[in-house]
Amino acid sequence: MTTALDQLKQYTTVVADTGDFQQLAQYKPQDATTNPSLILKAVQKDAYRPILEKTVRDHAGESVGFIIDRLLIAFGTEILKLIPGRVSTEVDARLSFDTQRSIDKGREIIKLYEAAGVGRERVLIKLASTWEGIRAAEVLQREGIRCNMTLLFSLVQAAACAEAGAQLISPFVGRIYDWYKKQKGADWDEAQDGGANDPGVQSVRRIYTYYKHFGYRTEVMGASFRTTSQITELAGCDLLTISPELLQKLHDSTEAVARKLSPDEARDARLERVAIDESSFRFQLNDDAMATEKLAEGIRLFSADAVKLEKMIEALR
């Protein structure tokens, strides 16, 4: 029997969402994504501790920020040895509201990859989908530096990223699901509120439809999954980035997977363009309590994990 994972690959490019690159080979993903939390999780494992220790040792006397950048590139280059496609490396979340410093950091990361023999076409720079992050992506894209816009929870963020010419967006599914499930509390009914009705699934479907309807070339990569149902409900999305745990579940399943998203259906939808000047962007984002709260929370969590990683490095110096 064909596995659910192999069926999914017929409709969607499968991406591995992990810093634990030793798990990549068995799932044969096209691309891979990382973030500060995943790198922090990886370097706490015995298998990856030597990479951290070597990076600190090789750059003794340099700043902690300098060492972290080299650590991200060390993980990225190892990941690229195991996949045919691209790796996403994230700009420090503490720069989420600083356009110029985000631009500078994106350029620096690409230079480090190129110095390691990796072409920029194999790297995506991850930026938070704040107004400032989107403006940074607009500049970097014009320079041939491709960007992956993360912490994306709303259509207005997606529309702004597309207008800025971002290579790819990562609309989150699981974190939207978490928010609505918490809001409903005891009234949440998984059978009724999950599956095709899952608010996170519906958000990505809405964004995908908007992009294909208006002919945007920005790729849509669903992210942040809690269940395999959320994944299979988005079969047909351009890409889906999936944790090793859920990749394993899909690999072990022979449940039928049908295409759920289609560019042809999206083109026939009746939609209006979203206004995306700065004031409209900020108002629409502010008007969406879920997106506002999850964006702020995501930046806080990634920033906190960056601080934890800095402390680990300090302890080794």
UniProtKB/Swiss-Prot annotation:
Its main location: cytoplasm. CDD domains: Transaldolase_TalAB (cd00957). Belongs to the transaldolase family. Type 1 subfamily. GO terms for cellular component: cytoplasm. Pathway: Carbohydrate degradation; pentose phosphate pathway; D-glyceraldehyde 3-phosphate and beta-D-fructose 6-phosphate from D-ribose 5-phosphate and D-xylulose 5-phosphate (non-oxidative stage): step 2/3. This is Transaldolase. It is found in: Cytoplasm. It comes from the Bacteria. It catalyses: D-sedoheptulose 7-phosphate + D-glyceraldehyde 3-phosphate = D-erythrose 4-phosphate + beta-D-fructose 6-phosphate. It is an enzyme of class 2 (transferase). NCBIfam families: talAB (TIGR00874). Transaldolase is important for the balance of metabolites in the pentose-phosphate pathway. Keywords: Cytoplasm, Pentose shunt, Schiff base, Transferase. The active site is at K126. Its EC number is 2.2.1.2. It comes from Burkholderia pseudomallei (strain K96243). One of its GO terms (molecular function) is transaldolase activity. Homodimer. The keyword Calcium does not apply. GO terms for biological process: carbohydrate metabolic process; pentose-phosphate shunt, non-oxidative branch.
